[in-house]
Every structure is written in structure tokens, then in C-alpha cells.
């Protein structure tokens, strides 16, 4: 199979916001307890955090982590999670029908984020609470000193403010499963007033308005237009959530699901711009795709979980090779929309539908989806270029034209990086033509290929991972490479001529 790309340095989508590679940790299952925090584990530091997990998270180059939920946040009293640990109450978590000990709270999570080099994206409870609790939390976290809440933070051991800059106005408030579920009109008014109060405390923060819980919601579209119309002037981002699965065990159909994500992003972008035009506003609302991933493997086992346990295993999907391929396609799709998608959170980070898994009495390990995400987060920084791609297509029941080649290019001062997925069951000879670009040569060609599509990683057996390929050549303004059957590929090239752009006269 043959495919071509034309990459021009002047055809740019936009700059990659590093927060595109964010993630999410919820007080749910073993994400926190036995995930990031396990004081009796051999690798635990003096604060009780697993250093093997810290090491794997740092490898992912994650800039920001959404916290503490998720459905959990709609019943969360943030005051329960501060002060002496011994005095913190145990609470029923109605979202996941477990018991929350509050042993890890705001201070502990902030300290863990310092270890992994990430900021917090804090969600506030707009299910059972509202304006007052939210503005008090901003004061507690961000106000320097001299008030009740800021001085309480200082007395709890944090002299300087946490300085949290990104805040979510609740979680999935359109969902009937949500504690405190609201209509679009109810939520829009509450979100507007909550954002207003929060920004009166700290006018440097940015806030995310809840969009639909997924594209299949019966209120999708109407919800977005209603809440945006109400809260537009007070908010900065609109959220999107979507998970994908291969319940039909149809690989071709499954690998096309990224086209659904592409359509979803385009639709929500259009809604934001519709309300902007209606209001004659100069303000642009960008997108926060703050829950996305693959989620379907664990559905049946979770139905059998007994209620009211502390940190039971929940949503511990074992990801396989085909999941890694789709995740690569989803990452490429997010990059294609880097002009409007400024935040995206892989949900979640540890144990719960996560790239990292832990053994209670053993080690932490990388799932198959870890590798595409890590490579994109490390190498996909800079400006996204919009290539012209020619590739054969196939059809599914949902999409008439699915390209066998899914690809995008990112450029920075030193490198041109091409991310590519071959969806096909034939090898692909890819020829990349360069316009206004000059290369010194290829730095590396990494590929994930040749695995059984159902192959998974296990503790001490991370066999589904990238390897180095020599099937690449760059010369005469072209890059030629062989993309193996069903493969995730990363081609890194060194730029010349002061960033690689040829001087134009």
C-alpha cells in the first residue's frame, strides 16, 4: 500500500498547549489508595507515596492533573480533606458506593503533584454544594494570607498559596447519574454565579464549564447552547467527555472511532462560535477535553463489586495492542484541533482505566496505552502542521471514508515529528514531501507493530512497547518510511537552517 504526505511549514493548525497532555485522578477504586499512595509499600517515600508510580508518571511528562473527580466531586466536602489526618471524617462516597477515608486530601495531593512536576486542575462540587463552598476553596488555595481560609491553609502547613489556575465548574451535570444532576438552565445559572464569585477571589484563574457527558446524550447540543448562553462571559473553556470501546470486536470499526472524536470536537467548536456570534462577543471559548480514553474491558467485573469498601478495584481495564493503536489515533485527532482544544485529560492515570497499573504487594507497570501517550507528550510539543494526506480508504457502518493512514506533524525549533497510525493489515510505504522545510536527517524512527491485537502487558512482562526501526530515509526534500501492518509510528527529524524553514524571497 502506498501513501503520501505533503508537509508545509506555512500550513499551521496552531501551537500545542502543553496541557493537551494532562491526566486525571479521581478518588475512586485504587487510583489514590494503593495507586499513588500506599505507606506500607517498599517504594513509599516518607509521605506514603509510591516512588515507583512517581517515576512512571514523570516519564509521561504530564503538565496538569484534574482532581478530585469525576462523579466523586459531586458529593465531596473539601473541608473534610484538610487538617490533621487523624481528625478527618470517613464519608460515604455515593458516586461509587465506597468509603472515602480522606487520608489523602488537598495538601497531600498538591505535594504529590510537586513530586511529579504537575499542576492541579481542581474541580468544585456543584452537585450537593455551590457558590459559597467554591469561593471558599479558591480562597483557601490561592489567597496569600490574612483571612480565615488562607490562614487556615497556613496553619495546616502550607505557608504560600497553592496557586491553582485551572478550575472545573462541577462534573457531568447533565448526567442523570450525577449527584445533584441539573437541567441546563439550572446548571448554567449556578455555573455563572460560581465562576463570578471564584474570579472575584482570584481574577487570574481560568474556569471550565461542563459540556455534555458524551456525544450520545439525548440533550447533546441543546445543553451546550443553553449553558454557554447563560455563562459565556464568566467562563474560559467548555468541557467534552468521551470514551471508546470495541464491544463488537470489530477491529476496522474500532480503529475508526477517532473520526467520531473529530466530529465531536468540530460540533462543539461550532456551538461555542455560534454563541459568540449571538452575543457579538470578542471572547473565544476554547475546549477542554477533560475526560477521554478507552473504557469497556472492566464493565462486567465491576457489576459484581460489593458496596462500601475502601478502595476496591474498580474499572481496572487491561489494555491490549489494538487499544494502543486507537489511542494513537485519538492523540493525533486532538493535535489536529490544537487551535481550539487547549486542555485534554487522559482519564485516568493510575489503576482506574489507566496507562499505569500497580500491584498491591508488587511493582508498578506500564500498560500498552502508556507508550503512545508518553511519546506524544514528550515529542509532540511545538506547532501543529496540517499535512495534505493521500491514502486509500475503507468504509464502516458509521463512516464512509476511513483513511488507512492517520497522521499529523509537529514542528519546534529543533525537530519535525510525524505521528502516524497504519490502520491497515498491509504494510504501507509512506512518502513525505517537505515544503519550506530543510532537514539534517532522521533522529529516530520508533514503531509499535507486530503484536497480536489482543496482546496485553503484565507485571514484569511489558512486551507490547515501541522498538527502533531502520526503515526510514530522509533525502532530497523527502522522507520515505515503511509503516508496518497495524502500527503506531513516531518519526523524529532534525531541522536545519535555523529551525528548518527555508528562507523565502
Model-derived regions: residue spans:
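Active-site His/acidic residue clusters
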Residues: 241-257
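Non-catalytic accessory regions flanking glycosidase/transglycosidase catalytic cores in CAZymes
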Residues: 1-223, 228-237, 261-262, 266-303, ...
